[in-house]
Amino acid sequence: MKDKVFFDTNIIVYLFDKSEEKKHTQARKIFIASLQDATSYISNQVINEFIVIASQKIENPIPLNHIRKNLEFLRTSLNIHTIDFETSLKAIDVKLKYHFSFWDSLIIASALESNCSILYSEDMQRGQVIEDKLRILNCFE
């Protein structure tokens, strides 16, 4: 059975942002490998954060018409977890137990609800295991 992996927003940003070449290359490598060897997920939260960061907060902002094309690519390549009321409640539980920010807890809750075993993130604690199910990995280390 293939692993299920979840991508945090920063991995998706680096996938399309070429201003940090080393991280861009590594994000592409992990992304391509995951498409071949795993079932991959993001959430609607990741999509919306990507739009804001890629269009406004990176060194060379990506035009919205290109972001739209990138999103179409992601939609055909990945499974999209839709955040609902239960996901928000799960995020509160994760925050209370593990002390992540609420937004990181929402990413974790989405990954757990998608039955993922790996969460790729640059920002969260590398190697931590959540609920004995989900391991956080930093693909840039």
List PLM regions with ranges.
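Structured helix-beta-strand junction loops
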Residues: 36-37, 76-77, 115
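Helix-adjacent hinge/juxtasegments
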Residues: 58-78
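General small-molecule cofactor/ligand-binding pocket signal
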Residues: 41, 81, 137
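Short, well-structured N-terminal submotif of metal-dependent ribonuclease cores
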Residues: 1-42, 57-65
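Alpha-helix capping/helix-boundary segments
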Residues: 11, 46, 87, 107, ...
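Acidic, PIN/NYN-like endoribonuclease modules and their adjacent C-terminal/linker elements
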Residues: 2, 108-141
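Active-site neighborhoods of divalent-metal-dependent phosphate/nucleic-acid chemistry enzymes
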Residues: 79-119
